[in-house]
Design a protein with these regions (language model features):
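Conserved alpha-helical scaffold segments that buttress catalytic/binding sites
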Residues: 2-221
Length: 222
């Protein structure tokens, strides 16, 4: 196992070689540019190779997973969660689309895959997509999703947004209490946070995806 709470850079596209933010920090570099079958979709062979290269790194920490084309990497990191947990996602898209090619993992469907396949994932808090996109999500998935739409975000002030997140996270992460588990059990579930760069302002991140709500800085979002 590598050092605890590392900053991990997962190099799929080579973009990090052109950026400066990490170069004066201690980071763990995971080279993945030579792995085929990873752009937007990730096939079984690629998953096996990625898991092999990341197996010695802890789930805790900060993982930079390249562009939004590789957001499905969050799903692979979540596989390692060995206790119940909740997931908070900032994204301009739902990432709950049905797969276009059978059951293959994709950047557009990884949240749905996580909800369907990960027993330890109790709730997803999804912040950012528009209401029309969320209406297309499978109703069976919505039972475990708390959704804050782009439209509501745009009319909320900072205090209202902070209140929503604080109250929502407190409620869903108190799952152990709601399930009637023993009082000496740990009260709050771990919270895994995943941020797609398309929710950030273009000064902080320029993406090839739509950035309609991307007015906030990285500091403001996280």
């Amino acid at each position: 196992m590598q050092e605890q709470n590392p900053i991990v850079l997962m190099n799929f596209s080579g973009i990090y070689r052109e950026e400066e933010f990490w170069k004066n920090r201690q980071v763990s570099w995971i080279e993945l540019q030579d792995v085929c079958g990873t752009n937007c979709y990730c096939d079984e062979e690629a998953i096996a190779e990625i898991n092999k290269r990341t197996e010695n790194y802890p789930t805790a920490g900060i993982h930079f997973i390249d562009s939004g084309n590789y957001h499905y990497m969050t799903r692979l990191w979540l596989t390692r969660m060995d206790q119940p947990f909740c997931l908070l996602v900032y994204d301009n898209h739902t990432d709950m689309q049905p797969p276009a090619f059978g059951g293959i993992l994709s950047c557009g469907g990884w949240i749905a895959a996580a909800l369907e396949e990960l027993e330890n994932l109790k709730y997803v808090i999804l912040v950012g997509p528009d209401e029309a996109a969320y209406e297309q999500v499978d109703e069976n998935l919505k039972d475990r999703v708390i959704f804050l739409s782009r439209e509501k975000l745009q009319v909320m002030n900072d205090e209202e947004r902070n209140w929503f997140l604080r109250e929502t996270v407190s409620e869903v992460c108190n799952w152990r209490k709601s399930e009637g588990l023993q009082e000496d059990a740990e009260k709050f579930l771990p919270l895994y946070i995943s941020v797609d760069k398309d929710v950030l302002c273009t000064e902080d991140a320029q993406t090839t995806w739509s950035q309609e709500i991307g007015r906030a800085s990285c500091r403001e979002r996280v």
